């Protein structure tokens, strides 16, 4: 056991424990050893590293996350000792070998993940094993339940509704219409959403343009009691913490294993107390799911898992072959959603159609509309301003103020991208549009993004504006323009594709 003086490191490496190389040599420890750092009864597990210059002898360097968990400050004395190897490592290897895991083995993996006993390398091995070997529904059910149980569980009375999209399509701001439509019909819909992970704007990023999203459970219950709905950031709550841990290793690997996709969605809904759920599965070129067949298979798995969890779930397969609406980026999307709530006849058809279709399904699930008539009721609530009024109630209850679409500010710098030829828009790349919007600064720069002047099938002439890039940074705008010229995300083709001559 070593007694060392704390030195706080301003770095974001959660498992790092740094000591002087001479201290390491004179101890029984080796680089990459798993150690327990202890202070006044609190313990954190870390991976040991050494340095000859960054840390003096007798010191221990700890990153901010570890400092916060231990409750230490600069100069405090902590102890380090050898940590036992995680019990779940053999189970991770078992899944790497392609074998089925028992419920208890899955519980151990999730527990040790949440307790900080697994390193990112070990978690990456587990995530990769799921990507390669998958899981059956018994395993997925066990993983979902444990992911929910390791965090906060919210209890409600009566039916609690929610809608969730698996994502992958830019501009998917449907929740800002669906939540107030459903809430205005008297159904309770506490919507928790994520911030952007790989997109230009998550639902929470868009709503945050208008109001607070970092509400506590107590605040959420108050808002829902007052308004029937809310739109908040799930990351501010301790819901299914293992989900956020796995996402952090999925992102750099660029993978999204289906077992984790299913568990991620359902664990958070289970933890939030949802018992009536609609899953949106965008499908098409450039979406996560490419075909109706693939989407139907995923939908059946969501429904089977939901049945096991006693959550009544329906799935909607929606068109995801191009962005939803015309706006991509937090402020631009908030502005477009508000416009749809103010006067839906002036808003993009794709946004309105998707929103009232999804809301209609929820209204039918809630028994406030007969089967087949939910969409009509949803459109009526939108047209009569009921959804707009309810949206403003929710925004104010969450700490914001009433605002109109023309009051939303977007980036002060902008650039129009023009069509190089006459023709028709034959394809819009979801990935390309997202990359350009992010290069412009979205989602961190809430005023950055893209506004599409055209959609697939539109006729254009040479020189017409295809889309406009917005940013609050002149440099970021220039960078986005350069990327736009490389990616060419909107494809325009003439009716004559090629001429074949006799010779």
Swiss-Prot record:
Catalytic activity field: AMP + phosphate = alpha-D-ribose 1,5-bisphosphate + adenine; CMP + phosphate = cytosine + alpha-D-ribose 1,5-bisphosphate; UMP + phosphate = alpha-D-ribose 1,5-bisphosphate + uracil
Active site: residue positions: 256 (proton donor)
GO CC annotations, alphabetized: cytosol
Cystine pairings recorded for this chain: none
Pfam families according to UniProt: Glycos_trans_3N, Glycos_transf_3, PYNP_C
Claim: Transferase is one of the keywords in the record: yes
Binding locations of AMP: 168, 194-199, 203, 264, 288
The keyword Transcription belongs to this UniProt entry's keyword annotation: no
InterPro entries in the record: AMP_phosphorylase, Glycosyl_Trfase_fam3, Glycosyl_Trfase_fam3_N_dom, Glycosyl_Trfase_fam3_N_dom_sf, Nuc_phospho_transferase, PYNP-like_C_sf, PYNP_C, Pyrmidine_PPase_CS
A GO biological-process term: AMP catabolic process
Enzyme class: transferase
GO MF annotation list: 1,4-alpha-oligoglucan phosphorylase activity; AMP binding; pentosyltransferase activity
Keywords, comma-separated and alphabetical: Glycosyltransferase, Transferase
EC number assigned by the record: 2.4.2.57
Functional description taken from the UniProt entry: Catalyzes the conversion of AMP and phosphate to adenine and ribose 1,5-bisphosphate (R15P). Exhibits phosphorylase activity toward CMP and UMP in addition to AMP. Functions in an archaeal AMP degradation pathway, together with R15P isomerase and RubisCO.
Family classification: Belongs to the thymidine/pyrimidine-nucleoside phosphorylase family. Type 2 subfamily.
Name this protein carries in UniProt: AMP phosphorylase
